A protein has these predicted regions:
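Selected transmembrane alpha-helices and immediately adjacent juxtamembrane segments
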Residues: 46-129, 207, 211, 224-225
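Transmembrane alpha-helix boundary/anchor motif
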Residues: 25, 29, 103-107, 112, ...
Length: 225
């Protein structure tokens, strides 16, 4: 299989785009079940991806243009049947992983509710939520998406959105934020293995999420005048 001769700059821009806009169908369905229209959520993410990549491209220095070939092995071509078998095995393990994570999250959430821990956790992160432009009430949903991602945190997000006393605008702001900036641990770590700068994997989409929510809030205020 031929390896594309991408530079570190190009890989960084691709990573930034993918970190914001990936798994759009599945995550769009999850977001639709918990407070925002899927097309609206997807459109926000795609626009945010394009704008963020354009801005990041302005800041990348020319000395990042070395082609990334060292340390990256080429994948050997596989027969179709073998490839299909490997895909089924990988998908099976992924399903088990998702099931275990979701079950663990639901059990943890139940324990936290029983001992009234959620209120204390949300209160601790309230300054972060305020900076993100989010209401403190959506704190547990934001934590689930930011740490575990929309897909893995789906059960918590959907369940809490249905049970919680959230208004439409609060949920829309939440989904704009987590749509752009979620799975802050696992997803960027995948690109770190390619030798990309950690700053560009975390900071741009975090700032984009903050800016997007505040602009959305401002637009609603102007609209209500």
């Amino acid at each position: 299989m031929v390896m594309l001769p991408l530079t570190s700059e190009q890989m960084t821009l691709i990573a930034v785009f993918i970190l914001i806009s990936h798994n759009l169908v599945q995550e769009g369905i999850i977001q639709a079940k918990s407070g925002i229209h899927p097309l609206k959520a997807t459109l926000f993410r795609l626009i945010a991806s394009v704008i963020t990549v354009i801005i990041v491209a302005k800041f990348l220095r020319p000395d990042t243009l070395a082609v990334m070939s060292e340390g990256v092995s080429m994948a050997a071509a596989q027969p179709f049947v073998a490839m299909l078998k490997n895909w089924f095995i990988a998908s099976f393990y992924l399903c088990i992983k998702m099931f275990l994570i979701i079950m663990a999250l639901m059990i943890l959430l139940g324990v936290m509710k029983s001992f009234n821990i959620i209120h204390h956790v949300v209160r601790v992160i309230s300054p972060v939520l305020k900076a993100m432009g989010l209401n403190q009430k959506v704190g547990i949903l934001w934590i689930a998406a930011a740490v575990f991602g929309i897909a893995y945190g789906a059960a918590v997000i959907v369940e809490e959105a249905k049970e919680g006393n959230f208004d439409r605008q609060e949920l829309e702001k939440l989904h704009i934020s987590i749509g752009i900036n979620h799975s802050m641990v696992e997803d960027p770590a995948l690109f770190l293995t390619l030798g990309l700068n950690a700053f560009w994997l975390w900071v741009p989409r975090l700032l984009t999420a903050v800016l997007a929510v505040h602009l959305f809030t401002l637009w609603h205020r102007i609209k209500s005048l």
